Amino acid sequence: MQLSPVTLPTTAEEAMAVQDDLRARVVAANPRPPVFATVAGVDSAYDDAAGLVATAVVVLDTATLEPIESAVAHGPVRFPYVPGLLAFRELPTTLSALEQLRTTPDLLVCDAQGLAHPRRFGLACHVGVRTGLPTIGVAKNAWGAWTEPGRRRGDAAELVLDGEVVGLALRTRDDVKPVFVSVGHHIDLPTAREQVLALTPRYRQPETTRQADRLCRAALRAATGG
């Protein structure tokens, strides 16, 4: 994939202004019939002592959930930790890993928030806007208010922030804590829900996230000699 270089803001105020500017580009609708033959998971891991971040992208065949291709990138953390500005810590290595792919995935799934974010522009939105690809955020924790969905796989409850529905608390396993699904870019919420369920046949987390998590942790260990 060919992507334009990323220039990071230098302050939290500048970063929030970037989010506010790019938010208008998010499309919360399917741009075409939502048929996804390939899906890529994106996840990052940190070594705080070394000041490093490693990101992995794993492309799966949606029919089998078997890996087709993967890529990793690591580098120094170039932006401080500020709640709501996680994207600026992970975006450089995320885009670097995506650029290495020979396969352009039909869908991206980020272990992060999308519209379920204080400024409605989490990492999944940022990556989606930068790549132009349909993107979903699937987070382990929620921004916003939600009620417990039903106990069965597939049960969902709205995730609400400032009176606006920004995502779903989605049960992917019976009697297991839900994940929090939100639109990143070029997809609607019902389709995002459907795709996340397709990616969770056995575990709470999508298979995309599980495989990317393993790979980014291995890449970080290799980078730090751990």
UniProtKB/Swiss-Prot annotation:
GO terms for biological process: DNA repair. The keyword Cytoplasm applies. It catalyses: Endonucleolytic cleavage at apurinic or apyrimidinic sites to products with a 5'-phosphate. Its EC number is 3.1.21.7. It is an enzyme of class 3 (hydrolase). GO terms for molecular function: deoxyribonuclease V activity; magnesium ion binding; RNA endonuclease activity, producing 5'-phosphomonoesters; single-stranded RNA binding. Its cofactor is Mg(2+). GO terms for cellular component: cytoplasm. Gene3D superfamilies: archaeoglobus fulgidus dsm 4304 superfamily. Its main location: cytoplasm. Mg(2+) binds at residues 43, 111. The record marks 81 as: Interaction with target DNA. It is found in: Cytoplasm. Keywords: Cytoplasm, DNA damage, DNA repair, Endonuclease, Hydrolase, Magnesium, Metal-binding, Nuclease. DNA repair enzyme involved in the repair of deaminated bases. Selectively cleaves double-stranded DNA at the second phosphodiester bond 3' to a deoxyinosine leaving behind the intact lesion on the nicked DNA. Belongs to the endonuclease V family. This is Endonuclease V. The lineage of its organism: Bacteria, Bacillati, Actinomycetota, Actinomycetes, Mycobacteriales.
